[in-house]
């Protein structure tokens, strides 16, 4: 009943439009906006378990699955901002989420995410194996070698990410938006959101590892400080 009432202020008008946007697709009974939000929450939840070495393969698979879900929804329906425009004209329901280019970008994102996950697991596994060394000097030398190898892995991964983002931007520019006045906005918003979300797990995993390795060459006080800093980064 409240939705049928005429809004008295601009604030109520915006609230009314926002509410309609969240429920724009009543025919399928799906709320893609909240589906996207839930996938983001699942990613945040998975970050905690992924950095736990004792979490097991099931939780690590959950980490990958949440990313695949997130980027598939993002590629098919772009960002949640797009939903704020669709309700304006339900007659133009020919939304191009079935475009082969968008589906292809979703598949590419999943493939790259699989590479990312494997890279992170191998890097963390290589660093973790050092704890079985018998002397501290051997552990330090081995960790330096492993860290150098890990940097090479991440350099390759950054190049792959750059190629992916260029391809993703190309697909978006080739995409004929239903609403021409929002096409540029959708491209910019989707590109920034996609890029930030893709590089965030690298930061959250690489930074703590570097801090842990750096703490080996410091005294006990600095070592504790660096280790706590790495834990804080993981929590963030």
Language model features with spans:
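Extramembranous, membrane-proximal N-terminal regions and early juxtamembrane loops
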Residues: 1-236
């Amino acid at each position: 009943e409240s939705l049928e009432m005429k809004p008295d202020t601009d604030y109520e008008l915006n609230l009314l439009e926002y509410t309609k946007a969240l429920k724009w697709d009543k025919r399928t009974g799906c709320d893609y906006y909240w589906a996207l939000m839930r996938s983001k929450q699942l990613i945040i939840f998975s970050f905690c378990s992924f950095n736990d070495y004792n979490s097991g393969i099931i939780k690590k698979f959950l980490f990958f699955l949440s990313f695949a879900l997130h980027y598939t929804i993002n590629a098919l329906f772009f960002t949640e901002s797009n939903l704020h425009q669709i309700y304006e004209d339900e007659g133009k329901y020919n939304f191009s989420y079935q475009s082969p280019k968008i589906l292809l970008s979703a598949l590419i994102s999943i493939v790259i995410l699989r590479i990312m996950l494997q890279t992170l697991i191998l890097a963390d596994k290589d660093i973790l194996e050092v704890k079985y060394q018998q002397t501290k000097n051997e552990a330090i030398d081995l960790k330096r070698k492993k860290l150098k190898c890990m940097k090479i892995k991440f350099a390759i991964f950054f190049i792959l990410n750059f190629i992916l983002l260029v391809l993703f931007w190309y697909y978006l520019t080739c995409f004929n938006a239903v609403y021409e006045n929002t096409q540029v906005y959708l491209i910019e918003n989707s590109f920034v959101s996609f890029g930030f979300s893709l590089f965030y797990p690298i930061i959250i995993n690489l930074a703590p590892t570097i801090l842990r390795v750096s703490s080996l060459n410091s005294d006990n006080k600095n070592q504790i400080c660096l280790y706590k800093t790495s834990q804080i980064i993981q929590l963030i």
